[in-house]
């Protein structure tokens, strides 16, 4: 018998990898994970061990089988004996005519004895039932429940006592009460404790905030569910091609000549088990949904091109997956190319703690070609293996809850939403609340374009019947009736749930010390962006050394270049602070940061960053001047004039540029110079300010290296007191 891996043995003998690992550990054989290679002699030991267990189980079943039969046989034997005793008596009567009367008397006596025995058996059965009924009437309840308060009459009714008796007890406790007096929780508990009855107060749950309601299922009701997979990676590394290849090989082979319908997600069947793929490649959608509190992904496939290696977006994708605490499977794509070097990719990814199993790590690497289809079956098997180890389960036997994947307004069908059912079962006709809209599920379509009547956990379906279009990432919940769904949907709309999300409390340096004191924070998440890689490394190293009150700094992402919208979304999802060193946020990043209430700190000196973070963590931040950007202008043309210098012909794109404001020159997201405006002109006239949509000429004091395409940002310093 040859060597094999743990998961191969499990697959061959139709047992789970966890059972095999557990058995090996019982045999004192060191096993790290499901990819560990086991020797031939160990395989034989396993075979013997599993065969013994099977034999023991069979013996147990044989012993358990004949439990009730002896009682029945004994009962039948007793009946036979009774019949046999009667038969000879009848025969004796027939043979002996003279003693006929005597025999009849004997027979009647025997009947009476037999009937008496029957009555004796029946009477003890009836008597206890009557006694139990009497006892039940007198017995006090073990527990009573109430909501808010109870009157004396209501409490007496719950306890099965007279109100006068309760009033007497209250009087003995120093409480003068009438039959209609409302009793508080303490009084109810005192009376009930006197009777030895347990009290439970019902807490009213606000179902309008159903995202915060956590329903704990009975472990017996949980069943295995398909994993939900998201594909991430750098641009042009083959994410979309891989999705298309999986769909063509697995979905279209089920559909003979059928056209699949794009609903934002689809399912494939591998070895009789389903896998759900979110058809939204890239980490942007992933992070946007996570920022809204929707954690839908179970496994992330990180696609890296074998001929290109690790790129900036690859690193971003790794950081996003780690921040969400989702297992990563690395798909090394384009191995069919002559320049492919998978080993180089593995080596580069080791820097980001993605160590291959072949090299002693715990990250699964799959070499494949999305174009030719090579290695795709192996990738799908690995997804099922990781899913098995993660023990993904859900309860299908309750009202459905889940998340919106996509939503749109269709001309013919009205609002259409793609929902991913995460728990329970969604059925046609269910009253549903989605985000801040509501409706009844009118029709359901699966990813193959077929009408379905119900959808279980991890199943994506497209539904119609909502009154408005929800947002991607919104949570949904099914309610018992349409009236309640309408009430909750309208209440949520009135609370303007969308605006409340944007006002979500974020961590900032201003309130950092308070959160540390209250024990709310154990780690301070930070995103670092700088102008050059050397600055990034120096800043990260310096920040990681900071530790105050047991709170450590955790760098969740770092990179070179301007602060982007995606950095802000990651900070929003991870409750992080963004630090920009010698770089500026672009216009979109500023807008998103303001909406998501993300704290951005911009610096040009490293020790100032360290000082500010340490001071914030110690609660020693002084009042400071806050920078307020008042406008931006784009340099369209430059003019060199002797004795004046370089004049920048600008177009004001945002806000306004004022004569007395400070300015900074930004080139490709990097700050080149900071200073003051020397002259500000419109045509030939000096002006105090130029508003958005107008052209102007600007010169900067002591600086002439202005180029076309540069951005001039105007700002003023305002003094603000810290709270």
From Swiss-Prot:
Keywords associated with the record: Cytoplasm, GTP-binding, Initiation factor, Nucleotide-binding, Protein biosynthesis
Annotated region (G5), positions in chain: 369-371
UniProt GO cellular component terms: cytosol
Domain named tr-type G: residues: 224-393
Superkingdom per UniProt: Bacteria
Residues annotated for GTP binding in this entry: 233-240, 279-283, 333-336
Job of this protein: One of the essential components for the initiation of protein synthesis. Protects formylmethionyl-tRNA from spontaneous hydrolysis and promotes its binding to the 30S ribosomal subunits. Also involved in the hydrolysis of GTP during the formation of the 70S ribosomal complex.
Name the UniProt record assigns to this protein: Translation initiation factor IF-2
Record organism: Anoxybacillus flavithermus (strain DSM 21510 / WK1)
């Amino acid at each position: 018998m040859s060597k094999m891996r743990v998961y191969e043995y499990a697959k061959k003998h139709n047992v789970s990898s966890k059972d095999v690992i557990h058995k090996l550990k019982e045999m004192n054989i060191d096993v790290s994970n499901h990819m560990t290679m086991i020797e031939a002699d160990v395989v034989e030991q396993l075979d013997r061990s599993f065969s013994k267990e099977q034999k023991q189980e069979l013996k147990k079943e044989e012993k358990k089988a004949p439990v009730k039969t002896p009682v029945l046989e004994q009962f039948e034997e007793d009946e036979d004996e009774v019949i046999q005793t009667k038969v000879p008596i009848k025969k004796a009567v027939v043979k002996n005519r003279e003693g006929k009367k005597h025999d009849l008397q004997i027979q009647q006596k025997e009947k009476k004895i037999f009937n008496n025995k029957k009555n004796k058996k029946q009477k003890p059965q009836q008597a206890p039932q009557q006694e139990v009924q009497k006892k039940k009437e007198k017995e006090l309840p073990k527990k009573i429940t109430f909501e808010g308060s109870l009157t004396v009459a209501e409490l007496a009714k719950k306890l099965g006592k007279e109100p006068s008796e309760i009033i007497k007890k209250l009087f003995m406790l120093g409480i003068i009460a009438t039959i209609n007096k409302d009793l508080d929780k303490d009084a109810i508990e005192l009376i009930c404790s006197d009777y030895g009855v347990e009290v439970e107060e019902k807490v009213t749950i606000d179902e309008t905030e159903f995202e915060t309601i956590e329903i704990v299922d009975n472990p017996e009701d949980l069943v295995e569910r398909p994993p939900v997979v998201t594909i991430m990676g750098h641009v042009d590394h083959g994410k979309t091609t891989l999705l298309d290849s999986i769909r063509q090989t697995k979905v279209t082979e089920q559909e003979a000549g059928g056209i699949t319908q794009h609903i934002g997600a689809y399912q494939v069947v591998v070895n009789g088990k389903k896998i759900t793929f979110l058809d939204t490649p890239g980490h942007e959608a992933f992070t946007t949904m996570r920022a809204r509190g929707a954690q839908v992904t179970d496994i992330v496939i990180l696609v890296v091109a074998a001929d290109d290696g690790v790129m900036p977006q690859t690193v971003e994708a790794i950081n996003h997956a780690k921040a969400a605490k989702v297992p990563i499977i690395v798909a090394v794509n384009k191995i069919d190319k002559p320049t492919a070097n998978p080993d180089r990719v593995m080596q580069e990814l080791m820097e980001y703690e993605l160590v291959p199993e072949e090299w002693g790590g715990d990250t699964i690497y799959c070499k494949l070609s999305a174009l030719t289809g090579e290695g795709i079956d192996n990738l799908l098997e690995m997804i099922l293996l990781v899913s098995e180890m993660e023990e993904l389960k859900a309860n299908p036997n309750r009202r459905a809850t889940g998340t919106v994947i996509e939503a749109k307004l269709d001309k013919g069908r009205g609002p259409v939403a793609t929902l991913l059912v995460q728990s329970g079962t969604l059925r046609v006709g269910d009253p549903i609340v989605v985000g801040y809209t509501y409706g009844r599920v009118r029709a359901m379509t699966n990813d193959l374009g077929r009408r379905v009547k119900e959808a279980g956990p991890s199943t994506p379906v497209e539904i119609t019947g909502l009154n408005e279009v929800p947002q991607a990432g919104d949570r949904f919940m099914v309610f018992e009736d349409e009236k309640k769904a309408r009430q909750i949907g309208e209440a949520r709309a009135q609370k303007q749930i969308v605006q409340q999300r944007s006002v979500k409390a974020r961590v900032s340096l201003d309130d950092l010390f308070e959160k540390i004191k209250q024990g709310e924070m154990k780690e301070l998440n930070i995103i670092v962006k700088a102008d050059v890689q050397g600055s990034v490394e120096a800043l990260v190293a310096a920040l990681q050394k900071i530790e105050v009150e047991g709170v450590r700094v955790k760098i969740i992402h770092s990179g070179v270049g301007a602060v982007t919208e995606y950095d802000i979304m990651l900070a929003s999802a991870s409750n992080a602070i963004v630090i920009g060193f010698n770089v500026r946020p672009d216009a979109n990043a500023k807008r998103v940061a303001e909406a998501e209430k993300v704290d951005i700190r911009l610096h040009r000196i490293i020790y100032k960053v360290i000082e500010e973070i340490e001071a914030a963590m110690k609660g020693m931040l002084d009042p400071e001047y806050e920078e307020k950007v008042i406008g931006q202008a784009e340099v369209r043309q430059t003019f060199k004039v002797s004795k004046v210098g370089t004049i920048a012909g600008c177009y004001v794109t945002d806000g306004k540029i004022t004569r007395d404001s400070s300015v900074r020159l930004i080139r490709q997201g990097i700050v080149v110079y900071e200073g003051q405006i020397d002259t500000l002109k419109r045509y030939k006239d000096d002006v105090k300010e130029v508003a958005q949509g107008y052209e102007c000429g600007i010169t900067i004091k002591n600086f002439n290296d202005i180029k076309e395409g540069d951005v001039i940002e105007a700002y003023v310093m305002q003094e603000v007191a810290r709270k």
